[in-house]
Amino acid sequence: MGDWSALGKLLDKVQAYSTAGGKVWLSVLFIFRILLLGTAVESAWGDEQSAFRCNTQQPGCENVCYDKSFPISHVRFWVLQIIFVSVPTLLYLAHVFYVMRKEEKLNKREEELKVVQNDGVNVDMHLKQIESKKFKYGIEEHGKVKMRGGLLRTYIISILFKSVFEVAFLLIQWYIYGFSLSAIYTCERDPCPHRVDCFLSRPTEKTIFIVFMLVVSLVSLALNIIELFYVFFKGVKDRVKGKTDPYSHSGTMSPSKDCGSPKYAYYNGCSSPTAPLSPMSPPGYKLVTGDRNNSSCRNYNKQASEQNWANYSAEQNRMGQAGSTISNSHAQPFDFADEHQNTKKLASGHELQPLTIVDQRPPSRASSRASSRPRPDDLEI
């Protein structure tokens, strides 16, 4: 049998532009048809005419009887079948090459327009037309070709023709040979003088190969039908998706990341929405705060306020025993909008401002001891 490498290379290029069913079909075609046909089947039918014998000495009788029994050799019949079922796939490959050629032209045109755009010329409309053509041809980013539009129709037509050819060759084989071979063939044809019996070489072995090729043809036909339904439903799904989201083919912008807000601490216990309140009080000092989930921070009750001031007074007395002087500016009261009694007591209070960014590291012992010492710039009461 001839060299199948040229056809194999062409069909191998279709792998990158086929569905999963198409890749399986090509694997079946290569392994169970072309490979088997070029090795075992050809050797089994190599002596079919030379080993065909009839019980007559009439010249030419064996030739006419062989021609009547086998109008075409099984091997040549299967070669024709492989060629016919491969032609639609090759036509689809030609369409893919056409789309790739179009892609090269569109990319070249797009680069030229971008160069002109850098000079200040408005070419947005032309660029949009190029993007529309790429989407129409099924061209995506990085040179990837997607089945869409005319390419999808060509693929569906190729599957239909492959299925039709499979069925047609199965019917022709059944009509000419059947799916089994007999050991004896009866022939009555000129120039045979009478009805003669002719004998076939290795009929059982040939019958096994015939049945095997029949099964492979049925499997290929089933794969074509499954792939046809898959591509059909995939096309319907893409069409529905395109109607719901007509701009799905364009690149989507990635959402910008939210910048984290700085970590501020407040005298009244409120903290920034994204950062927890940093520890601001000395050791042993408790500050009862309200619920931080409330953004207004106005839900503090009177008991919490009294507890805060009691803790603060106790700490002030303890620090006073150590000989430190506390600045009056540090003893500002808390400002509550809904506590009128507290605002009357703390008439000297001012609106509290948020501190700057708080260092998350805990204060060292040296710094805590140094903070209790009086400084020259402290205001004395």
UniProtKB/Swiss-Prot annotation:
InterPro entries: Alpha_helix_dom_sf, Connexin, Connexin43, Connexin43_C, Connexin_C, Connexin_CCC, Connexin_CS, Connexin_N
Swiss-Prot/TrEMBL keywords: Cell junction, Cell membrane, Disulfide bond, Gap junction, Membrane, Transmembrane, Transmembrane helix
Annotated GO MF terms: gap junction channel activity; gap junction hemi-channel activity
Keyword Membrane attributed: yes
Key word Isomerase present: no
Gene Ontology CC entries for this record: apical plasma membrane; cell junction; connexin complex; intercalated disc; mitochondrion; plasma membrane
Residue ranges annotated as Cytoplasmic topological domain: 2-23, 98-163, 229-381
Biased composition (Low complexity): 361-373
Signal peptide per UniProt: none
Disulfide bridges in this chain: C54-C192, C187-C198
Cell compartments where the protein resides: Cell membrane; Cell junction, Gap junction
One of the protein's GO biological processes: heart development
Extracellular domain ranges by topology: 45-76, 185-207
Organ and tissue specificity: In all tissues, but mostly in lens.
Membrane topology according to the record: Multi-pass membrane protein
Pfam families attached to this UniProt entry: Connexin, Connexin43
UniProt-annotated stretches for the region Disordered: 338-381
Self-association state and partner proteins as the record states: A connexon is composed of a hexamer of connexins. Interacts with TMEM65.
Primary role: One gap junction consists of a cluster of closely packed pairs of transmembrane channels, the connexons, through which materials of low MW diffuse from one cell to a neighboring cell. Plays an essential role in gap junction communication in the ventricles.
Similarity section: Belongs to the connexin family. Alpha-type (group II) subfamily.
Protein name per Swiss-Prot or TrEMBL: Gap junction alpha-1 protein
Taxonomic source organism: Gallus gallus
Taxonomic classification: Eukaryota, Metazoa, Chordata, Craniata, Vertebrata
